Each structure stands twice: as structure tokens, then as C-alpha cells.
UniProtKB/Swiss-Prot annotation:
Biological processes per GO annotation: translation
Keyword Ribonucleoprotein in record: yes
Keyword annotations from UniProtKB, A to Z: Ribonucleoprotein, Ribosomal protein
Transmembrane domains' residue ranges: none
Gene3D superfamilies reported in the protein's UniProt record: 3.30.1330.30
Xref: InterPro entries: Ribosomal_eL30, Ribosomal_eL30-like, Ribosomal_eL30-like_sf, Ribosomal_eL30_CS, Ribosomal_eL8/eL30/eS12/Gad45
Biological source species: Thermococcus sibiricus (strain DSM 12597 / MM 739)
The protein, known as: Large ribosomal subunit protein eL30
GO cellular component term, pick one: cytosolic large ribosomal subunit
GO molecular function: RNA binding; structural constituent of ribosome
Pfam families for the chain: Ribosomal_L7Ae (PF01248)
Xref: SUPFAM superfamilies: L30e-like
Domain of life: Archaea
Matching PANTHER family: RIBOSOMAL PROTEIN L30 (PTHR11449)
């Protein structure tokens, strides 16, 4: 699977939330279907997101690149440490975590 292609497709056809605060809120409420986290996200953020995602049974995918690389991959001029897939749209992004 081409990660960049599927992420862009999810952004265009589905509902994707970018940012630590909003992603954390979705993890707490169980509204996200997949959380994507940059490998260099701060440790406390990683710990919190893994805890809340675990409580809500939301899969967490650790992106192999940095937050700068994740931002660039999405065509954004800023860093992205956390993002949540709420609706995948026409993408197959949920297959990252064995989703449907």
C-alpha cells in the first residue's frame, strides 16, 4: 500500500483530524477509527495516546518518519505529530492496523 496516496485519499474523501489536542479528544471519546503518530512524537504524548486509544480499542499506527516528514507527506507547511482517521472515505488507510 502506498501510504502517501492512501492518506491523501482519506483527506480528500473522508474525515481526517490533524493535531495532538483534537486527536487526543477523539481517542478519549472513541470516535477515531485509526490514529497515526509520528515516531518522534513526545514521549508523554505517545504514552497518553496509547493509553486512551487502548481504552477505546482504537488502533495506533506509528509512522516511521518524523513529524516534519508526516507534514510534508500530507502537503502541509507544518509538523504533524498526531492525526486521526474518523472516516476513511474511499481510501484503504484502515488496513494499516488490520481494519476493514
Amino acid at each position: 500500500m502506498d501510504l502517501a496516496f492512501e492518506l491523501r485519499k482519506a483527506i480528500e474523501t473522508g474525515k481526517v483530524v490533524i493535531g495532538s489536542n483534537e486527536t487526543m479528544r477523539l481517542a478519549r471519546t472513541g470516535e477515531a477509527k485509526l490514529i497515526i503518530m509520528a515516531k518522534n512524537a513526545p514521549k508523554e504524548v505517545k504514552d497518553d495516546i496509547n493509553y486512551y486509544a487502548g481504552l477505546s480499542s482504537i488502533p495506533v499506527y506509528e509512522f516511521e518518519g518524523t513529524s516534519v516528514e508526516l507534514g510534508t507527506l500530507l502537503g502541509k507547511p507544518f509538523v504533524i505529530a498526531l492525526m486521526a482517521i474518523v472516516e476513511p472515505g474511499e481510501s484503504k488507510i484502515l488496513s494499516l492496523a488490520g481494519g476493514k
